[in-house]
Every structure is written in structure tokens, then in C-alpha cells.
Amino acid sequence: MITRTRVIENLDELLSHGNREGRRIALDVLEAGLAAPDPYDNVRSVVRLEGRRLVVGNPALSQPPGREPVEFDLDNVGNIYVVGGGKAAQREAEAIEHVLGDRITEGQINAKKGDSIRLKRIGVTLAGHPIPDEESVSGARRILEILRKARRGDIVFLCISGGATSLTALPVPGVSLADLQEVYRVLYFGAGANMPAANAVRNHLALMNTKFARYVGDATLVSILTTETPPKLKVHLFERPDSADPYNAAIDVLRNYNCWDAMPTSVREFLLARDPQYGPLRKEETQGKPHYHFRVMGPEYMLEAGLRRARELGLNAT
């Protein structure tokens, strides 16, 4: 049984004056909405133990269409690793830690500097955001080390949320951290690039951004994801501009934002070289492999929960 912590901490103060009944209803709806996207609670409802079986999935949450829960017999599972990064990744990993405890072999999460460290069995590195830093790189190297240990029969939980791109930035060969930082500064603060456009560039320049699956071999990969856009929206944060050549897409973004010439020489040379081993994941790299993806947080969670609670309270809500 999961007990939720109240989100609105000053509830009593807010109910101490004015139209108390009206406030109570409004705050009740707001509390339901604010609590719904909590990554810890949602992961606890998705990842659970049923005897000696590890069950992952919860059809009650918004998941990819057709995604049914998957089950693993723990007696037949080897090592269990937990890795990832993002501003909500610690909460995701904390839920897994509380479910699996000492069944977790090891792990590494990169979280944002300023956060408190919440994990006990899983390593945590506090790294830079929105500009990656040395800690982003050192923590990402640790993640890569763990991913490369995984073998058939092992399970790798990948916890990803907003901010993971900078927090787990490990530059590709030939591009320094300083050069990668300059790319972020130019795109974000100079050109004002939107997220899909920025991702089209920066995901090429780091070893793992959107490419974690490349390094897990034949191990089972269970991705626990949050997204900032509702699933029905056409544009998703991880999508890239249409292009038959993804490297061309990155180059086109830089030219369209008039910042190609502002890019460090190493970045321009890397993109023009079009090395496929560092490009986006190819379908054949993961086809037929035991990879599962579960979405545990999105903005529609808040809206849908608030709507349900309003109707439960007898309001004519739409």
C-alpha cells in the first residue's frame, strides 16, 4: 500500500479564511492534479513484486498503445542494474530501490546539482544543468561502465526524465566538454532553439543521449520514462527534424538558426564526417531484443486526475 505525502503543505492556512468550502473543493481538485504526476508513486505502481515474480507495467497509467505488463522470474534473473539521469530520475530510481532492495547489483543516477541525494544502493552524481559539466561527464562514464557489464539474463532499468541530455552528457571522441558546452550556450542562449531542434544537434554529440540501448548488449532493458508533452501531440521532445540523413538534420538546424559558423571546429568536423557508429540508434541495433519502455509521467496525468476528482466531488467538469 503506497501512502502519498500531501503536496499542498500549507493546506490548513489556505482553508483558514474566506469561502472555506469553495476553497476546500478547489484545493482538493488541485491536490489530486499535483499528486498524479509524481514519478515515485507512479513507478511504485508500475514496478512491483508478486512473490518471486517481478512485474513491470500498469495499464491504468498512460503507456504506449498495446503495452502489457511484463513479468520476470527472479530465480532466472542475473544482475539487476539501475542507471539514468534527469531531474526526476532519483525519484524514479528510489521507487525501484524500495521495491527491489538488495536485489539491485549496482547503479548510477545523474541528478541536478542542488538536489539532495536520496538513494542508498544506487550511486548518485550531482551534475550540471542546463549546461553539462565535469560531473555530467564523470557520472555518464560510470553509467556507461555499468551498461557494458550487462549480459543476457540481466535486467537494466533505465530511468530518464527531463534534463537527462545535459546531466548525462559524455562527448563523442574528438569533441571536448568545453566545445559541447559552447554548443549548448549557443543553441539555448544565443539562438533560442526549441527543444526538438536542439536535440537534433546535441544528441549527435554525446555517446548516450537517446542511445543508451546501444550499450546493453543482450541484456533486458526496461526504460522508465517521463515526457513533458502529452502523447497525442504530434511534436515530441525527442523527435528530430525530418531528414533521410540525421547528420544533415543537425547541420540544417545549425544553418537555419544562423549558428553553424559559431560552432567549434571539432563539432563541425564531427557532423560533416557523418560517422554512423555515433549516430542515432538504427532499427537493426535493437530489433528483436528484449527492450521495454514505460511512460510514468506526463502533463496529461495532472489534467486527467484533476478532472476525475472534480467529477467525484459532483462538479460538472470537462
Kindly give the residue locations of the regions a language model identified.
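An N-terminal, well-structured beta->alpha segment
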Residues: M1-V83, R91-E92
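Glycine-rich oxoanion-binding loops at beta->alpha junctions
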Residues: G57, S62-G66, N110-R152, P196, ...
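Active-site cofactor/substrate anionic-group-binding motifs, chiefly glycine-
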Residues: E71-N76, Y81-D115
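Short beta-strand segments
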Residues: V83-G85, Q108-A111, F157-G162, N199, ...
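A glycine- and small-aliphatic-rich helix-loop capping segment at beta-alpha/alpha-beta transitions
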Residues: A95-I104, R121-G123, R148, P171-E182, ...
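Short, acidic/small-residue loops that bind anionic groups at enzyme active sites
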Residues: T105-Q108, P173-V201
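A glycine/threonine-rich phosphate-anchoring loop and its flanking beta-alpha core
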Residues: A193-W260, V267-L271
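Accessory alpha-helical/coil subdomains and C-terminal extensions
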Residues: V222-S223, D242-A317
